[in-house]
Curated annotation (Swiss-Prot):
Positions with a binding annotation for GTP: 17-24, 86-90, 140-143
Gene of this entry: fusA
Name of the protein this chain belongs to: Elongation factor G
GO molecular function terms attached to this record: GTP binding; GTPase activity; guanosine tetraphosphate binding; translation elongation factor activity
UniProt KW GTP-binding keyword: yes
Phylogenetic lineage: Bacteria, Pseudomonadati, Pseudomonadota, Alphaproteobacteria, Hyphomicrobiales
All residue ranges annotated as the tr-type G domain in the record: 8-287
Any one annotated GO CC term: cytoplasm
Source species: Brucella suis (strain ATCC 23445 / NCTC 10510)
Length: 694
């Protein structure tokens, strides 16, 4: 079967926004107008098509990027194929947004007309900048009290540092919003609000004529800057035709020079069809964006893969999901070549082969089996064994590793334990499945406490994962409070001379050791023997080292593992009959316990390297707050229109920080933190910790 739609007629795009900007409603409208949905699902009914996990329907927020294929007849009457990826708008799920953006060619940024550019919009916009994704902006909820299109346009410049290019103006606002002025055609488009009704095309209202002229002039001035010939013609007094103007806007949008801005209200069905036309006219086809880069596995040199069916097959797995009916599904974007059911592909990241069994085209939560797919397609593959997010699948004869995605390290950890014995095994399986789906979620076992520790991007992130474990895997578990891993060390040298004697009929036990314990700069334990002349026979020396190592795991202050200790065996004595390896082990153990006390034991705590990216207005508050958390500020620098604050802060003082930072900066600041080093705990704090763990 040949390709049904030319690759030039594909549009792979996502809708990105702050939570509550109306993204799910907008996607629903798009699916309705493009003919895939018969009844529109409203988010506040919990009946939305794209939000298909139970938690999403309950909470009314989108957690998982669902990929949907649909079709639209553009202004020219030609049918185009849309692959839409829905993305979450909550800070804890930015990993989902990041991996969606990685496989998109373009995006629509949705703004709430009342709030304008909100914190999460800034975060997502920054991620889109990183991948150089062409974007349009749709100012939604124009019917809302306080809706202000012009303020939203201004904020795109001031908050996002982007060039705004309005291609429409609103007619009326709040309850009086009826339609838009099309600045390219210079016509008014109005809707009566009935579902699916086409726009009525008319003349621009007289009271808006001057404003429309002013904005059209600005539009043309920005658009002609993209092309030298158009610029020269314009300066000589020749205006571009409407089609030429569209072509210039398309070029500038794809080159990320500016961002077309449209407006409407998805909920009231006004402005949706012109937005779909704009997707066709301004957002790129897979062939309009640069060919994807990768590393040729055979030559280890950089290579590219063109968006063409003739090129060798290459695709990127960008998401893994557990589907209640099909099991594990791997979503992949085909960048080049043609994929046929039943072929074997190379996973070049894992070095393993994968057979493509079942291939599905997804429509939110319904699915259609397909036998082949082409460059530009987004497909769901069932039953892959080895592939995880970010892996490349390709033609085994032309192996390539496509650019990988970067995933942030988790910032919060909690201990979790199953409620019953029966839950124990199921919990292990559930956690492994969830970790395979979500690269920002990690699972590990704490060697010291034996507990299972889960780590993620925030409190909501972990809440939802524990909740999913309960619903999808029927595992009941208790989650604990976040914990800090302290350590202990010594501050000075101490020499210990210890004799172990035990006489209890028959042969006894005897061992004498003389050891110097001292601190050293590393984190590891160093053992050295300086025995000369056989005061301790060679065969007993390993017993001395083993004895010390066996008690290093629990320090004298609060039972935490010890770091940075050097032990030097300098002398000792033995008995021909009563000495043994075990006797020397016992003697060195007791010597270490005594030595750790004498050598000035101290508590150490993990210090985190913290980076906060904040708008300038909140820098003072952020620095003050970090100081109050015993933080040391190491510097600030400008990054675009934001400020970066770098600091070293004890982990114990960072719990709950994400919520404090959100409220302090109205959600506009972000932070990352990673472990840097251990440092002595201040005396007052150390006493509290010792009491707690004694």
């Amino acid at each position: 079967m040949a390709r049904e739609y030319k690759i030039e007629d594909y549009r792979n795009f996502g809708i990105m926004a702050h939570i509550d900007a109306g993204k799910t409603t907008m996607t629903e409208r798009i699916l309705f107008y493009t003919g895939k949905n018969h009844k529109i699902g409203e988010t506040h009914d919990g009946a939305s098509t794209m939000d298909w996990m139970e938690q999403e329907q309950e909470r009314g927020i989108t957690i998982t990027s669902a990929a949907t294929t649909t079709f639209w007849h553009g202004r020219d009457g030609k049918k185009r194929r849309f692959n839409i990826i829905d993305t979450p708008g909550h800070v804890d799920f930015t990993i989902e947004v990041e991996r969606s953006l990685r496989v998109l060619d373009g995006a629509i940024a949705l703004l709430d007309a009342n709030a304008g550019v909100e914190p999460q919009t800034e975060t997502v916009w920054r991620q889109a900048e990183k991948y150089h994704v062409p974007r349009m902006v749709f100012v939604n909820k124009m019917d809302k009290i306080g809706a202000d299109f012009y303020r939203s346009v201004e904020m795109v410049g001031s908050r996002l540092g982007a060039v705004a290019l309005p291609v429409q103006l609103p007619i009326g606002a709040e309850n009086d919003f009826v339609g838009v002025v099309d600045l390219i055609e210079m016509k008014a488009l109005t809707w009566d609000g009935t579902i699916g009704a086409p726009a009525t095309v008319g003349e621009i209202p007289a009271d808006m004529a001057d404003k429309a002229e002013e904005y059209r002039e600005k539009l043309i001035e920005l658009a002609v800057e993209i092309d030298e010939a158009a610029m020269e013609a314009y300066l000589e007094g020749t205006m571009p035709t409407n089609d030429e103007l569209r072509a210039l806007i398309r070029k500038g949008t794809i080159e990320v020079k500016f961002h077309p801005i449209l407006c409407g209200t998805a909920f009231k069905n006004r402005g949706v069809q012109p937005l779909l036309d704009a997707v066709v006219e301004f957002l790129p086809a897979p062939t309009d964006v640069p060919a994807i880069k990768g590393i040729d596995v055979k030559t280890e040199t950089e290579t590219t893969r063109e968006s063409s069916d003739e090129a060798p097959l290459s695709m990127l797995a960008f998401k893994i999901m557990n589907d209640p009916f099909v099991g594990s599904l791997t979503f992949a974007r085909i960048y080049s070549g043609k994929l046929t059911k039943g072929v074997s592909l190379e996973n070049t990241v894992k070095g393993k082969r994968e057979r493509i069994g079942r291939m599905l085209q997804m429509h939110s939560n319904s699915r259609e089996d397909i036998d082949e797919a082409f460059a530009g397609d987004i497909v769901a593959l069932a039953g892959l064994k080895e592939t995880t997010t970010g892996d490349t699948l390709c033609d085994p004869l032309k192996p390539v590793i496509l650019e990988r995605m970067e995933f942030p390290d988790p910032v919060i950890e909690i201990a979790i334990e199953p409620k019953t014995k029966a839950d124990q095994e199921k919990m292990g399986i559930a956690l492994n499945r969830l970790a395979a789906e979500d690269p920002s979620f990690r699972v590990k076992s704490d060697e010291e406490s034996g507990q299972t520790i889960i780590a993620g991007m925030g409190e909501l992130h972990l809440d939802i994962l524990v909740d999913r474990m309960k619903r999808e895997f029927k595992v009941e578990a208790n989650a604990g409070a976040p914990q800090v891993a302290y350590r202990e060390s010594i501050t000075r040298a101490a020499e210990i001379d210890y004799t172990h004697k035990k006489q209890s009929g028959g042969s006894g036990q005897f061992a004498r050791v003389k050891i110097i314990f001292e601190p050293h700069d590393g984190d590891d334990f160093i053992f050295e023997s300086k025995i000369v002349g056989g005061s301790v026979p060679k065969e007993y020396i390993p017993g001395v080292q083993k004895g010390i190592e066996s008690v290093m795991g629990a320090g004298p202050l609060a039972g935490f593992p010890m770091l940075g200790v050097k032990a030097t065996l300098i002398d000792g004595a033995y008995h021909d009959v009563d000495s043994s390896v075990l006797a020397f082990e016992i003697a060195s153990r007791a010597a270490f316990r005594e030595g750790a006390q004498k050598a000035g034991a101290q508590l150490l705590e993990p210090i985190m390297k913290v980076e906060v990216v904040t708008p300038e207005d909140y820098v003072g508050d952020v620095i003050g707050d970090l100081n109050s958390r015993r933080g040391q500020i190491s510097g600030t620098e400008a990054r675009g229109i934001a400020t970066v604050v770098n600091a070293m802060v004890p982990l114990a003082n960072m719990f709950g920080y994400v919520n404090s930072l959100r409220s302090m900066s109205q959600g506009r600041a972000q932070y990352t933190m990673q472990f840097d080093h251990y440092e002595p705990v201040p005396t007052a704090v150390a006493q509290e910790i010792q009491k707690k763990f004694a």
